Every structure is written in structure tokens, then in C-alpha cells.
């Protein structure tokens, strides 16, 4: 019985130690969520300004540009998956990977070949475990995204997009990431990045209003050449910031759940230890009483 008490005591100590770790990680994630939200808010004006500029050029010009023109036939499509570098974040990475699998299945049903670009070690590990290939990978920047990484991803995607599919290029590009809705809610989202789908269009003039006259210097094509890579980089960087905030929120939620479970384990093992101690004491009392009765009857 004493051995059983020691086992329960050891389990209680182990659960308490685990709770200290998960509680610390929960607090760290809570702090990082605030910083991630601040970075999202700080980048929003720039992203909106770039989007409005691209919207104006795309709306008020009739130029055919490779980044805004729908291809006659889509043969190859790229999927960029934004996962995490670390685990202990609940279903954060698994949800975005599941969403990407559903997207890939849809694209294949349309007769398109798939090329993968992976961001985050969890996505890389997922593909390696299944012995599946990817075009390029980026790791080490999911928790604190850097614009240089977004630019690297954007340059690689634009280069692949302007290359004909017959020469190894792609006809369209999709990104899959977790959008940060709130601390309690993060949703996997799919966005078609190229050909360009302007998210924030230019408002149409009211009845009787005169359409503004836009003059582009130099040519419209040159303006698009300069604006669209910047737009792609800003969209990718926004996806990285959204994903980072979602990762910290998911990790905070997972660590809080782990801390709560540790509390429940401590309560359960404490009750079991008390029951074992009570049983041991009762057994000892019974042995003492039985011994006393035996001595009394032997006289």
C-alpha cells in the first residue's frame, strides 16, 4: 500500500510540474498575441493603400497584363501552405493542411497539376512523412514574420507565374493560411493570389457622377509591372501576420487546456492518494485490533 501512495504522490508532482510549464507557455503566447495584433494593425494602412492603387490601375485601364488576365486553360496550379514551425498549438497546422488537401482535391478534379510551396516546419514534416515533393520551402519565421521572407516568397511565385506551364511554370497560385478572427477563433482560409483578384475594389460613382480621368505615366503595363509585385508581397506578408497571430492564439488556447487538465489530474490523484491512505490506515487499525483480540483470547 505504501508503494501505491508513492506512485500517486509522484504523479501529483509530475502533473504540477507540467502545469507550471504549460502555464508559462500560455502567458508567453498571450504576450505574443498582443504584439502580433499590433503588427497586423500597423501593416493594414500600407496594405490598403497598395490594394487601392492596384484596384485603380486594374479598373480604369483595358491593358492585357499577365498578372491580371485569366488564362484560356489552366494546366498547373501552385498552392502555398502557411503552417507553423513549432507544435503544441492544437489543431493550428492540421486545420490548414486539411484545407490545402481539400483544395488540391478540387483542383485535381478540374484537371490541374499541383505544385506545392511550404512555409513552416510542420508543413515540411507533413510532406516528408508522406514522401511528397514540394517546389520550395521556408522555415524559421512563422512566429515572427519578416518582410524579407514575404518578398522572397513573392519573388519566387511571380517568377513561377510568368513562366509558361509548358516550361515548368504555373497558371494560377493559391495561398492557404489561418485567418485571425479573434483570440478564440482562427479559421483556415483559401485565397487565389494569381491571376490577380482584387480584394478591395474601387467604389463605383453615384448616379450622374462623372468617371475620373486617369493618366498613367509611364505606360499602364509598366505601372502594373511595378505595382503588382508589391501587391503580392503585401498580401503574402498579411497572410504571414494573420497566421502568426492565429498560431499564438491557438497555442495559448492549447496550453490553457493543458493547464486545466493538469489541475484535474492533480485533483484526481489527490483523491486516489487520500483513499489509498485511508485504506492503509483502516487496514493498520484492523491489524492492531485483531492482534489485541488474539492476545486477549490467549490469556
Swiss-Prot record:
Keywords: ATP synthesis, Cell membrane, CF(1), Hydrogen ion transport, Ion transport, Membrane, Transport. It is a peripheral membrane protein. Disulfide bonds: none annotated. The keyword Transport applies. InterPro entries: ATP_synth_F1_ATPase_gsu, ATP_synth_F1_gsu. NCBIfam families: ATPsyn_F1gamma, PRK05621.1-2. Its main location: membrane. The lineage of its organism: Bacteria, Bacillati, Actinomycetota, Actinomycetes, Micrococcales. Produces ATP from ADP in the presence of a proton gradient across the membrane. The gamma chain is believed to be important in regulating ATPase activity and the flow of protons through the CF(0) complex. Gene3D superfamilies: 3.40.1380.10, ATP synthase, gamma subunit, helix hairpin domain (1.10.287.80). It holds the Pfam family ATP-synt. It is found in: Cell membrane. Belongs to the ATPase gamma chain family. One of its GO terms (biological process) is proton motive force-driven plasma membrane ATP synthesis. One of its GO terms (cellular component) is plasma membrane. This is ATP synthase gamma chain. GO terms for molecular function: ATP binding; proton-transporting ATP synthase activity, rotational mechanism.
Amino acid at each position: 500500500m505504501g508503494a501505491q501512495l508513492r506512485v500517486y504522490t509522484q504523479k501529483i508532482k509530475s502533473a504540477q510540474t507540467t502545469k507550471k510549464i504549460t502555464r508559462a507557455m500560455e502567458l508567453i503566447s498571450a504576450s505574443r498575441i498582443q504584439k502580433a495584433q499590433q503588427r497586423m494593425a500597423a501593416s493594414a494602412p500600407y496594405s490598403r493603400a497598395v490594394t487601392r492603387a492596384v484596384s485603380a490601375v486594374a479598373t480604369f485601364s483595358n491593358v492585357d497584363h499577365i498578372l491580371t488576365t485569366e488564362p484560356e486553360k489552366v494546366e498547373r496550379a501552385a498552392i502555398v501552405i502557411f503552417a507553423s514551425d513549432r507544435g503544441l498549438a492544437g489543431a493550428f497546422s492540421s486545420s490548414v493542411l486539411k484545407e490545402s488537401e481539400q483544395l488540391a482535391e478540387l483542383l485535381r478534379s478540374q484537371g490541374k497539376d499541383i505544385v506545392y510551396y511550404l512555409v513552416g516546419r510542420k508543413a515540411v514534416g507533413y510532406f516528408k512523412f508522406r514522401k511528397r515533393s514540394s517546389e520550395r520551402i521556408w522555415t524559421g519565421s512563422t512566429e515572427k514574420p519578416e518582410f524579407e521572407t514575404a518578398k522572397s516568397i513573392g519573388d519566387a511565385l511571380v517568377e513561377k507565374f510568368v513562366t509558361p506551364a509548358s516550361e515548368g511554370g504555373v497558371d494560377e497560385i493559391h495561398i492557404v493560411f489561418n485567418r485571425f478572427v479573434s483570440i478564440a477563433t482562427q479559421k483556415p482560409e483559401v485565397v487565389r493570389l494569381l491571376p490577380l483578384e482584387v480584394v478591395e475594389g474601387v467604389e463605383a460613382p453615384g448616379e450622374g457622377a462623372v468617371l475620373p480621368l486617369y493618366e498613367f505615366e509611364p505606360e499602364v503595363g509598366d505601372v502594373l509591372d511595378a505595382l503588382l509585385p508589391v501587391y503580392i508581397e503585401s498580401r503574402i506578408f498579411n497572410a504571414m501576420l494573420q497566421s502568426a497571430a492565429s498560431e499564438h492564439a491557438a497555442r495559448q488556447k492549447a496550453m490553457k487546456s493543458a493547464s486545466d487538465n493538469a489541475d484535474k489530474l492533480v485533483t484526481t490523484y489527490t483523491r486516489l492518494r487520500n483513499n489509498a491512505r485511508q485504506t492503509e490506515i483502516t487496514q493498520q487499525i484492523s491489524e492492531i485490533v485483531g492482534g489485541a483480540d488474539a492476545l486477549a483470547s490467549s490469556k
